[in-house]
Every structure is written in C-alpha cells, then in structure tokens.
Amino acid sequence: MEQVVVIIGSTSDAQKVEPAIQILQEFNVEVGVYCISAHRAPDGLKHFVKKINDSGHTLVIIAAAGKSAALPGVIASGTIVPVIGLPLGGTPLSGKEALYSMTEMPPGVPVATVGIDAAKNAGLLAIRIIATQVSDLALGLERYYENLAKKSLEVNEQIHMQYAENRSSDHFQKV
C-alpha cells in the first residue's frame, strides 16, 4: 500500500482529485488512486479499508466525494488512519451537501475536511500529517511555504507599483 491512498466514489471524480495527486508527487509521496463507491460497493470498500489497515504502510487517506458524500465517513469508521474528506462540487447545491456531510460526523468518527474542490489543500494536509514523522518532508514543506510567501510578496510589490504609477496619472486625480 502507498503512503497516501486517494479514494474516489465515481470515475467522474477522477479529474477533480488531480491537484492532490500532483502536489503529493511533487513532494515524492507514494500515492495510489482507487475508485470504490460507498453506496454501490460497500462490502468492497470495507474489504479495501481492511487491506489498508493490514498493510500498516498507509499514513493518510484522502476520500473525495460529492452529493451525500458517505465515502469519508464509512472509511473513517473502519480505520485509525487519518481520513481527509474532500467535498466535491458540480452538484445542484454546489458541493455544500458534501461539505456538510463530511463536517457533521458523529463523535468517535473524525474526518478532517478541506474546502469544496480544494484537492491541492487535501494533498498538502496529507503531506503535513506525514511530515510530522518524516523530517525530509518537513524541510521540503518549509521550502514550499517560504517560496509561496516570496511569490505573494512579489505580487504585492507588482500590484503596489502598478497602482502607484496610475495614481500619478489623470485617471486617479480628483475632478
């Protein structure tokens, strides 16, 4: 089994989890992607979660689902491996029903949940969890966030300069 297992409930969800897979691969985290529906194949999902438990290798599970979004909760009920719920949009309620389903879990069945369609954040949260045990990964995350801050400050400077130049033009002068 891989360090991070991404489980989707439908093939239509595959493209939506790509940002999570990409960031995990960028950090050289072993990732596997599986499609097992909590509604259509509950016994198959139970068997797969048991396989994850028996392997002892998987450190985080990302479960992506839309609509009623039972997938993360069903997975979390069968494992002590941290489960990150990734609510997916593209539904009549724009993913809110999936978000509510994942955040309103009963006591004893925790699911960490990221924002609707926030696959990259799901991947980054998985990396953060693993980085508590893997120092090389922690160092990589530090560099990642330093670079993110640097880019943000560069954008700030560009925006500031753009509007500073415009302030001196007639466009911003009082009438």
Predicted regions and their residues:
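Glycine-rich phosphate/diphosphate-binding loop of Rossmann-like nucleotide-binding domains
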Residues: 1-40
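Glycine/charged-rich beta-loop-alpha catalytic/anionic-binding loops adjacent to active sites
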Residues: 2, 28-31, 54-58, 81, ...
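Short glycine/serine/threonine-rich phosphate/pyrophosphate-binding segments
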Residues: 13-18, 42-45, 65-74, 93-96, ...
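N-terminal beta-loop-helix "entrance" segment that forms/cooperates
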Residues: 33-54
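Glycine-rich phosphate-binding loop
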Residues: 48-87
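Short, glycine-/small-residue-rich phosphate/pyrophosphate-handling segment
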Residues: 93-139
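Glycine-rich phosphate/pyrophosphate-binding loop and the adjoining helix
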Residues: 130-175
